[in-house]
Regions:
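Acidic-glycine-rich active-site phosphate/pyrophosphate-binding loop
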Residues: 1-10
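ATP-dependent carboxylate-amine ligase
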Residues: 6, 16-19, 25-192
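Histidine-centered acyl-transfer/condensation active-site motif
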Residues: 13
């Protein structure tokens, strides 16, 4: 962290992505505005524990990490995946599993932005139940990198077929996503 063109502190935390960096800088600026030194604010941020459903590690099975994230529209999906890519590097595969569950996503208002939002993922799996639009068609620009399924069990089967040790799976929805996180972890543990 720089303040008045000089180093003022360093934030070391497990959060990734430009959006979290911007939030941290805003917090440091707000703290400075009320009299907290930037170095002290940076040190405090280093102790910050992220909130639930924001790149929350739900578990690891068969060498595969499974995360939960609240991302539920293309910009949030893109931000989450770009941050994860920045964190894990180019060699680690990212499997994005998402449920377009918000009202605007169910209606297909932003469906044309989905391929763009998923660019940082190596593979994408879309749960299509309840949609008023053709997700496979919307994701067609991604080619074989995108798959769709109308129910959770089929979606899990697709992910299991693709997932390998060392991969990172991030499940994104603004709801409970049918308990997919625990179901994936159990299925991965059984599969080995």
């Amino acid at each position: 962290v720089f303040y008045k063109d000089a180093p003022a502190g360093k934030v070391q935390w497990g959060l990734s992505g430009v959006h979290n960096q911007m939030n941290a800088l805003a917090a440091i600026a707000a703290a400075q505005h009320v009299g907290v030194a930037p170095a002290e604010a940076a040190q405090a941020l280093s102790r910050f524990q992220n909130v639930k459903r924001r790149m929350e590690l739900r578990g690891t099975a068969a060498g595969i990490q499974v995360y939960d994230d609240f991302a539920h529209h293309p910009t949030a999906i893109r931000t989450t995946l770009d941050g994860l890519r920045q964190q894990v590097g180019a060699q680690t595969r990212i499997l994005a599993v998402f449920e377009p569950r918000s009202n605007t996503m169910k209606l297909g208002t932003m469906k044309s932005q989905l391929p763009w939002s998923l660019e940082s993922a190596d593979l994408a799996f879309c749960h299509t139940a309840g949609l008023d639009w053709d997700a496979a068609q919307a994701l067609a620009p991604m080619g074989a990198r995108a798959q769709t399924a109308g129910n959770i069990d089929s979606l899990i089967a697709q992910v299991l077929q693709a997932a390998m040790a060392g991969d990172v799976i991030v499940c994104m929805s603004n709801g409970g996503f049918g308990g997919i996180h625990d179901k994936l972890l159990q299925a991965l543990a059984v599969r080995g």
